[in-house]
Amino acid sequence: MVKIRLRRTGKTKQPSYRIVVADSRSPRDGKFIETIGYYLPTRQPKVLEIKADRARYWLGVGAQPTEVVVKLLKRVNVLDEQGKVIAEA
């Protein structure tokens, strides 16, 4: 199964995350298929950048986002409140 999840990068106590598409069997920071964005929670304000078209593509072909990624995708208007993909405007 393909998942959209966070891949931790950065230094100790200074996390940054890449939003990646990966096989669910691979380790958290292991092999991945594609990077579709990044999230910097330690910056003020928090920085979130997602390639919406690629996220919609992967969701369309059946990739399952993790709970945290669902919240991030809702924040950038890729998913609606029910978790359905919003068509491009």
Curated annotation (Swiss-Prot):
Keywords: Ribonucleoprotein, Ribosomal protein
Gene Ontology terms, MF aspect: structural constituent of ribosome
Any one biological process term the GO annotation gives: translation
InterPro entries: Ribosomal_bS16, Ribosomal_bS16_dom_sf
Pfam families on file: Ribosomal_S16
Domain of life: Bacteria
TM region positions: none
GO cellular component: cytoplasm; small ribosomal subunit
HAMAP family for the chain: Ribosomal_bS16
Family stated for the protein in its record: Belongs to the bacterial ribosomal protein bS16 family.
Name of the featured protein: Small ribosomal subunit protein bS16
